[in-house]
């Protein structure tokens, strides 16, 4: 699908008589194909799902692991939302995990045209790995490559999940500071500057044992946004990828329940 002059990998998962459309946004260095179980759970509950690979990731065209501006993912998602809304007269919900959680949170302070947002382990504040670049200035180091090291017993307590992550050819082995700094510094700064603009119903989820993005980030975000319809839940036995850890079935059930409650209003 052509979005902002780039061919994006976009896959629609259709159902009969859908209640709503859920658009999935994945995290840094991964791809949308890792969310099959969530797609299946949403389809089973009569939600059509649209998943896509972010710019610089997966099967989307263009240089991998790079980003010109933190604004690009927001505008890419916005155009996708407009396409989805033009094709189906249905409520639209956004789901995002980790950097994808940051992206949907940023979307929420920029646009107000979706019916709800589900934000999982969002990097909504400055993670420790990028703090040095905040001091130095990431734009001066945008050409530097960083090795992906998330699968270091930090993604999930299920070993097979980390093994599959490492073996997956669509996951990035390296990414550039232009991507990490652009999103985790520039994007985070933008989000926190505009928190008062966030008005969309939101469900915030986080692993209680997350060592990549501290759960305190989600608690902080929850407390700072002035939204009437907001919920938060921690999964105390899970690491960063709550959808791939030991509480994953409960997470999927909670997401469906949250959506059902709002779609039926």
Regions found by a protein language model. Name each.
Residues 1-15:
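N-terminal cap/lid segment of alpha/beta-hydrolase-fold proteins
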Residues 34, 39-62:
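Conserved alpha/beta-hydrolase
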Residues 198, 204-206, 210:
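Short beta-strand/loop motif that positions the catalytic acidic residue
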Residues 109-144:
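Flexible "cap/lid" loop of the alpha/beta hydrolase fold
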Residues 214-223:
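Short alpha-helix in the alpha/beta-hydrolase fold that links the catalytic acid
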Residues 231-265:
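Catalytic active-site module of serine/aspartate enzymes centered on a nucleophile-bearing elbow/loop
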Residues 96-100, 104:
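Gly/Ala-rich beta-loop-alpha elbow adjacent to hydrolase catalytic centers
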Residues 29-31, 58-84, 88:
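Catalytic nucleophile-loop/oxyanion-hole region of alpha/beta-hydrolase
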């Amino acid at each position: 699908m052509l979005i902002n002059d780039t061919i994006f990998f976009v896959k629609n998962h259709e159902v009969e008589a859908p209640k709503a459309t859920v658009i999935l946004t994945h995290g840094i260095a991964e791809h949308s194909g890792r969310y099959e179980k969530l797609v299946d759970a949403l389809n089973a509950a009569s939600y059509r799902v649209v998943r896509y690979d972010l710019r610089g990731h997966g099967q989307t065209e263009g240089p991998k692991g790079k980003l010109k501006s933190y604004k690009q993912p927001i505008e890419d998602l916005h155009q996708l939302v407009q396409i989805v809304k033009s094709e189906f007269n249905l409520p639209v919900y956004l789901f995002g995990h980790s950097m994808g959680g940051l992206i949907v949170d940023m979307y929420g302070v920029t646009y107000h045209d979706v019916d709800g947002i589900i934000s999982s382990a969002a990097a909504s504040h400055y993670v420790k790995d990028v703090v040095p670049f905040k001091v130095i200035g990431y734009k001066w180091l945008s050409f530097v490559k960083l090795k992906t090291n998330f699968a270091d017993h930090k993604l999930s307590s299920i070993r097979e999940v980390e093994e599959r992550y490492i073996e997956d050819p669509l996951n990035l082995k390296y990414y550039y500071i232009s991507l990490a700094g652009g999103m985790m510094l520039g994007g985070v700064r933008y989000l926190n500057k505009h928190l008062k603009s966030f008005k969309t119903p939101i469900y915030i989820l986080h692993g209680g044992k997350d060592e990549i993005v501290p759960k305190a980030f989600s608690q902080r975000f929850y407390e700072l946004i002035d939204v009437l319809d907001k919920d938060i839940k921690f999964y105390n036995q899970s690491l960063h990828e709550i959808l791939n850890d030991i509480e994953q079935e409960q997470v999927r059930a909670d997401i469906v329940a949250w959506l059902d409650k709002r779609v039926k209003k």
